[in-house]
């Protein structure tokens, strides 16, 4: 248990940040899952509407990742890794290698 006021305040701040980071990461994972689902839907039935959905979901996920890095929820290397993983999946679906 914390003995002084500063330590008690740091505990409160850490808990506040933990909750904020948890919601941010949850939203980020949701957007990434939506992008992966859109990729699967496009691979099953290719079309302009499905392609637009993939593109929109990828842009939303990229935006959320960039904001998470900016705020400090994610480390920039982790953000780059997530974006790379997402773009590789999208590239594989949209431009299948012959």
Swiss-Prot record:
This is Small ribosomal subunit protein bS20. One of its GO terms (cellular component) is cytosol. Coiled coil: none annotated. The keyword Ribosomal protein applies. GO terms for biological process: translation. Belongs to the bacterial ribosomal protein bS20 family. Keywords: Ribonucleoprotein, Ribosomal protein, RNA-binding, rRNA-binding. GO terms for molecular function: small ribosomal subunit rRNA binding; structural constituent of ribosome. Pfam families: Ribosomal_S20p. InterPro entries: Ribosomal_bS20, Ribosomal_bS20_sf. Transmembrane segments: none annotated. The keyword Lipid metabolism does not apply. Binds directly to 16S ribosomal RNA.
